[in-house]
């Protein structure tokens, strides 16, 4: 009998304890108020997301998310992958097709406790201009038909053609070597790339104009003005093409080997100097289509609106990506007229006739990324 009383007593206590827990109302359970998007990405291997150029960047403080997409691409049914705070939900749901055709879309996150937060996701359209260096041809109006340049680019080949053709007659210079900028099958992708080599053009003068001991291999967006060669060599490089877009980035692939023997402008061997390659981009404003910056003014003019540069003196044996992010020193105004230059040189100080024989820069798959700006 006493054992039965104890059993009933313990059973009663157990029931009371259980009732304490089960009697708690669900509303008394602590629920999270976190309503954040912790990750927002696009799988660009999915066909629906092919237009996406950059992964989204989350600005938590302002509840905004931004990404870039190709101007000509389809953004009417992009499929984002979204992660949110534990226990929260998001609408539209992760994996759903969402239209960004209007430029933005909103996503609402609801926390466990019902707290909500609305994010605005903006799609900034960009346009791309790409150069693959597969097509080479003699420039229209070239003085010497043997000159071959990559499509869309000017090179120092025109200057070396002058040395080859005028040197023997007017300066006692006989240069029979390769042109500095050549098509090569050593490419990052496709069949060919551009090879820029600084070559030994002997030095001396032609009709009173100095010929460098080493001519730097160079390639640029712009025009080579052969008519200026005998009066002002720095004016031969007319940098920049008319540009109706706002460039923000220049990307591509390069590899580089500096030459062993460095010579100064006087043709003197400088055993203690090391060559380096240079890659730069310059956007500048013009009053007319004929206005241009040249070798003397391209980096110093007050017309410059944006610039970026990169260089290295290290040997880079394999194709390596480079990226120039333009830094704007003036506001971009779509109603104004601009020219844009991208410049590659196997010898960074080659314009001043300081370079190493054999410095070689390979360039392939160059892309200019432009922000779409309404007028």
Language-model features, listed with the residues they occupy:
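Extracellular carbohydrate recognition
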Residues: 334, 347-370
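C-terminal motif of bacterial Sec signal peptides marking the signal peptidase cleavage site
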Residues: 19-23
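Residues within well-ordered beta-strands of beta-sheet-rich folds
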Residues: 132, 249-255, 280-282, 323-327, ...
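Short carbohydrate-recognition loop motifs
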Residues: 183-204
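Extracellular carbohydrate-recognition regions
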Residues: 124-168
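Extracellular carbohydrate recognition and processing domains
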Residues: 288-335, 356
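Extracellular-facing segments of soluble proteins and assemblies that are Gly/Ser/Thr-biased and enriched
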Residues: 200-289
């Amino acid at each position: 009998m006493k054992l039965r009383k104890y059993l009933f007593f313990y059973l009663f206590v157990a029931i009371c304890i259980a009732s304490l827990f089960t009697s708690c109302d669900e509303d008394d359970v602590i629920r999270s108020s976190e309503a954040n998007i912790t990750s927002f990405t696009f799988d660009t291997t999915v066909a629906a997301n092919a237009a996406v150029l950059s992964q989204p960047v989350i600005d938590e403080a302002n509840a905004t998310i931004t990404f870039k997409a190709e101007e000509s691409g389809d953004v009417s049914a992009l499929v984002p992958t979204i992660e949110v705070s534990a226990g929260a939900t998001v609408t539209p749901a992760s994996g759903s097709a969402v239209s960004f055709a209007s430029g933005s879309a909103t996503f609402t996150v609801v926390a466990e406790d019902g707290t909500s937060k609305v994010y605005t996701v903006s799609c900034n359209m960009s346009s791309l201009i790409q150069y693959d260096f597969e097509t080479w041809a003699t420039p229209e109006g070239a003085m010497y038909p043997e000159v071959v340049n990559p499509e869309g680019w000017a090179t120092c080949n025109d200057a070396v053609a002058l040395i080859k053709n005028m040197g023997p007659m007017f300066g006692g210079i006989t240069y029979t070597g390769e042109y500095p900028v050549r098509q090569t099958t050593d490419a990052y992708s496709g069949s060919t790339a551009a090879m820029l080599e600084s070559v030994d053009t002997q030095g001396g003068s032609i009709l009173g104009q100095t010929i460098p001991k080493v001519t730097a291999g160079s390639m640029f967006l712009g025009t080579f003005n052969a008519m200026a060669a005998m009066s002002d060599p720095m004016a031969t490089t007319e940098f920049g093409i008319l540009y109706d877009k706002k460039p923000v980035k220049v990307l591509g692939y390069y590899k580089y080997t500096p030459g062993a023997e460095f010579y100064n402008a006087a043709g003197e061997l400088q055993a203690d100097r090391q060559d380096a390659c240079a890659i730069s981009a310059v956007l500048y404003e013009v009053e007319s289509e004929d206005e241009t910056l040249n070798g003397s003014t391209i980096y110093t003019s007050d017309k410059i609106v944006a610039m970026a540069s990169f260089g290295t003196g290290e040997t880079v044996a394999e194709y390596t990506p480079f990226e120039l992010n333009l830094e704007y020193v003036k506001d971009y105004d779509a109603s104004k007229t601009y020219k844009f230059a991208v410049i590659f040189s196997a010898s960074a100080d080659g314009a001043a006739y300081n370079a190493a024989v054999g410095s070689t820069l390979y360039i392939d798959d160059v892309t200019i990324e432009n922000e779409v700006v309404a007028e």
